[in-house]
């Protein structure tokens, strides 16, 4: 994500010397602890050393986690160019990781959190944790999407979980989620928690079987989540469009032939309530995962154009 970062940090009012940088996840460290568990910022204006490191902000990992943390997904960047009503320069960044955490970074000129507490550039805080471990397989490999809720007027982040390297895994205990999480402090930056004290799934409404909106999160709730059945996993980042978040989902095959392709679904969910609106897509619905069946194979990120949904599939399609 490319943007201009304040050269003098908190409180900087002079923007002429702001620096163009690229912010990205630290990558995939696989088995090496501490490699890739960060937000990496690249200086795009260093002519003497092109592509030089501007800053690496380490993400605090969970000591109790059995997952080697990394950040393979792209960050969500909020700047005055991408959102209305913002008075700061620079940006706020949200980044998910394999441990199932969402970390918020302050890369703006904000100097106060609105409550009288000092804010510094490069500050970070853990917004949410989904409680991932190797048993439940709730890795966050993919990026998130974000929108301002039409009803709540708050920033919502959408994410999904699943072991993308072992997409056909049907080991007992695997249980993945579709998630809608709100940041009630946006557009400010506030120190919330370290990973061990961050809000978790218990602060969210379980809207798994809700098709009426009866389980819509209240103001005090952190958001909503949907439990995927039959070892299903998300296969790309969600896409939010006109009040609905669309998730590409893969359900492993139930065939005795483990080389058979599993089923690809699009789960359409109300962005603020977590209500399952997949039936509105006009496709046949899955038996247990009540999402719109697309075909057999793995779906890409869903793209919207002209009120239509588009996606690639690595298999057989059955969609009009």
Predicted regions mapped to residue ranges:
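Beta-propeller fold recognition
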Residues: 1-320
């Amino acid at each position: 994500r490319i943007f201009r970062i304040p050269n003098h940090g908190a409180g900087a009012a002079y923007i002429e010397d702001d620096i163009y940088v690229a912010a990205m996840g630290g990558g995939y460290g696989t088995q090496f602890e501490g490699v890739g568990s960060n937000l990496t910022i690249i200086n795009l204006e260093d002519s003497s050393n092109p592509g030089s490191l501007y800053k690496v902000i380490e993400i605090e990992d969970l000591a109790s986690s059995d997952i080697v943390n990394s950040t393979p997904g792209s960050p969500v960047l909020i700047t005055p160019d991408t959102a209305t009503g913002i008075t700061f320069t620079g940006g706020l960044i949200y980044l998910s990781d394999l441990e199932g955490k969402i970390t918020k970074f302050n890369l703006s000129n904000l100097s106060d959190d609105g409550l009288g507490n000092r804010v510094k550039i490069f500050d970070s805080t853990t917004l949410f944790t989904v409680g991932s471990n190797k048993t439940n397989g709730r890795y966050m490999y993919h990026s998130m999407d974000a929108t301002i809720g039409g009803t709540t007027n708050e920033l919502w982040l959408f994410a999904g979980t699943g072991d993308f390297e072992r997409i056909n895994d049907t080991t007992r205990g695997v249980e993945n989620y579709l998630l809608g999480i709100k940041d009630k402090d946006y557009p400010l930056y506030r120190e919330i928690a370290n990973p061990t004290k961050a809000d978790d799934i218990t602060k969210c409404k379980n809207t798994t079987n809700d098709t009426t909106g009866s389980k819509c999160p209240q103001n005090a709730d952190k958001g909503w989540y949907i439990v995927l059945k039959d070892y299903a996993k998300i296969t790309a980042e969600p896409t939010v469009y006109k009040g609905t978040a669309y998730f590409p989902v893969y359900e492993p095959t139930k065939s005795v032939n483990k080389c058979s392709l599993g089923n690809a679904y699009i789960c359409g969910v109300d962005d603020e309530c977590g209500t399952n609106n997949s039936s509105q897509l006009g496709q046949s619905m899955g038996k247990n995962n009540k999402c719109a069946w697309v075909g057999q194979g793995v779906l890409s990120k869903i793209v919207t154009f002209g009120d239509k949904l588009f996606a690639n599939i690595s298999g057989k399609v059955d969609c009009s």
